[in-house]
Amino acid sequence: MNGKSCFFIGHRETSEAIYRTLYAAVEQHILEYGVTEFIVGHYGVFDRLAASAVKAAKHLYPDVKLILLLPYHPAERPIPTPDGFDNTFYPPGMESVPRKIAIVRANRYVVDHVDYLIAYAWHPASNAWELVEYGRRRKGQNHLQVTILKR
């Protein structure tokens, strides 16, 4: 990951009504924070909306890159780079991680290595919420900045 980077985390069942707020956060991270790489998963509505917001922003900011996070080894579960994405990323060391926790572990790896986190998580009994809390705890250790989108 090069330059300033940002990861998205949110609930799978997110309402599409959050899109405008999400797009505004993407644009803010590009213009105010100098983010050039956005990393997103592909397992739910929030991930789809986050990817759509970055794809829309790329029309105005062509230097911005959109990267798809792969929690499963590409040889085991091949996924071609989707339209609008610039690349895929499979975190190193994930080969021995059990499939059951691969998504959680891949997400945590990315949180440990990005500069910014845009989050939309409100349900305390969820992996998304736990990852946001993890990011908040990491904030002082690795200078991660967390943006929480309001419901």
Residue ranges of each PLM-predicted region?
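Acidic/glycine-enriched connector segments
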Residues: 1-151
